[in-house]
Design a protein with these regions (language model features):
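Hydrophobic/aromatic residues within well-ordered alpha-helical segments
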Residues: 7, 98-102, 126
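Short secondary-structure transition/capping segments
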Residues: 26, 82-84, 129-131
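Generic detection of short hydrophobic beta-strand segments and adjacent strand-loop junctions
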Residues: 88-92
């Protein structure tokens, strides 16, 4: 959700349904949500953290009037762009240390030689959306 808000703007309305289907732990493991960004763009998402591995899918689809863009969040599958002109695959190499920039930023902040931009204030919009989806607000 933070990636989507970074791309499309702040989510201003959100609602969700959630349940604990597998009872492996206390947290919700199956979630369905719908939301609207500040520009009026609608979005929806479904997450099931206890589904069979044959049903595992990691895909965000952005559908617009000129085509569709789909990409993975956790896997480094090629980005797919589909338009009236056809399908294009865009390969983005896996960075060697994906967490390194945030770790470096935190360390430099603690050493007083930099400023970490990830703060509780910057996390608030995503936390608000999560709480709305989970029915906690």
């Amino acid at each position: 959700l933070d990636l989507l808000q970074d791309i499309f703007g702040v989510i201003t309305r959100a609602h969700g349904y959630c349940s604990n289907r597998a009872h492996l732990y206390k947290a919700e493991d199956t979630i369905s949500a719908c939301f609207f960004f500040e520009n009026g763009l609608p979005g929806s998402g479904s997450w099931c953290f206890v589904g069979h591995k044959s049903a595992k899918e990691d895909c965000i689809e952005v559908i617009g009037e000129k085509g569709m863009l789909s990409f993975s969040v956790y896997n480094y599958d090629p980005i797919q762009l589909v338009t009236s002109e056809g399908r294009t695959s865009i390969v983005v190499p896996n960075p060697p240390y994906v967490q390194l920039p945030i770790i470096r930023s935190v360390i430099e902040h603690l050493q007083g030689i930099g400023t970490c931009t990830c703060t509780s204030v910057s996390a608030t919009p995503v936390n608000w959306v999560l709480d709305r989806i989970l029915g906690k607000l």
